[in-house]
A protein has these predicted regions:
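Glycine-rich, often proline-containing surface loops adjacent to acidic residues and nearby aromatics
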Residues: 83-84, 140-143, 170-177
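Oxidative protein folding and maturation machinery
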Residues: 1, 21-28, 60-61, 68-73, ...
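Short aromatic-glycine motifs in intrinsically disordered, low-complexity regions
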Residues: 42-55, 189
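Surface-exposed amphipathic alpha-helical segments
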Residues: 24-39, 56, 60-62, 171-202
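Signature of long, low-cysteine stretches enriched in small and polar/charged residues
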Residues: 21, 26-28, 112-169, 185, ...
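Bacterial Sec-dependent N-terminal signal peptides
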Residues: 1-28, 32
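Terminus-proximal functional modules
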Residues: 21-40, 48-50, 69, 109, ...
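Secretory pathway targeting signatures of secreted, lumenal, and periplasmic proteins
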Residues: 59-116
Length: 202
């Protein structure tokens, strides 16, 4: 199964293709990210607030990032268990209903633009059949979880997304935890730890 690839080389390759040029400064990686905005600097802890008006409790090892238009990718840049948080916002008037098919369409459009491999033919996509969604009845929050994969490549994993309607900003903020841990048998604990990061958003 693509979501459970156990090849250590694949893990390194995923890092080289998808993660942040801020993790290393090699000319090869610079070329890989020529199509998307990127940075070689350490993560400013106030960047989520500056971009999206939010605060969240990130693990101490989240130091790498990639910044795009209304998009922020944060990572621990680990070599074995790659944990990522993606933040992006979409204007509310562009969303008529937030159900699973609509969410997958929106997610795929954002990831296709911001999370690519060495060529434009390699990009992150959502396995819609794996996705389930539910609403938190106490807040204006929707949750979605499922599997992601790299189109035209053998990499994948699990994700969970918190979608927050923000009437004051006339948008919906999407906060995702994205895991790539092919050598880890029980990924549930890792996903729940990442989910607490999403729940810390204020």
């Amino acid at each position: 199964m693509k979501s459970d690839m156990k090849n250590s080389w694949t893990g390194w390759f995923f890092m080289a293709l998808i993660l942040l040029s801020g993790c290393t400064n090699t000319p090869k990686q610079e070329a890989m990210y020529a199509t998307t905005p990127h940075t070689n600097q350490r993560l400013p802890r106030n960047l989520p607030k500056k971009m999206f008006g939010i605060a969240l409790q990130l693990p101490a090892d989240f130091n790498s990032y990639k910044q795009g238009e209304h998009f922020l990718w944060l990572s621990n840049n680990d070599t074995e268990v790659v944990e990522n948080i993606a933040l992006y916002s979409i204007k509310e008037n562009a969303i008529s209903a937030l159900n699973v098919p609509r969410f997958c369409h929106l997610r795929d459009s954002v990831m296709h633009k911001n999370v690519r491999g060495i060529s434009d033919a390699i990009y992150m996509t959502t396995l819609q059949a794996s996705v389930r969604g539910w609403k938190d009845n106490t807040t204006s929050t929707f949750w979605f979880e499922g599997l992601w994969e790299m189109q035209n490549d053998a990499m994948g994993g699990r994700f969970i997304c918190r979608a927050i309607k923000r009437p004051s900003r006339h948008d919906i903020l999407f906060a995702e935890a994205i895991l790539y841990a092919p050598k880890t048998e029980n990924k549930t604990i890792l996903m729940r730890q990442l989910q607490t990061v999403l729940q810390s958003i204020k």
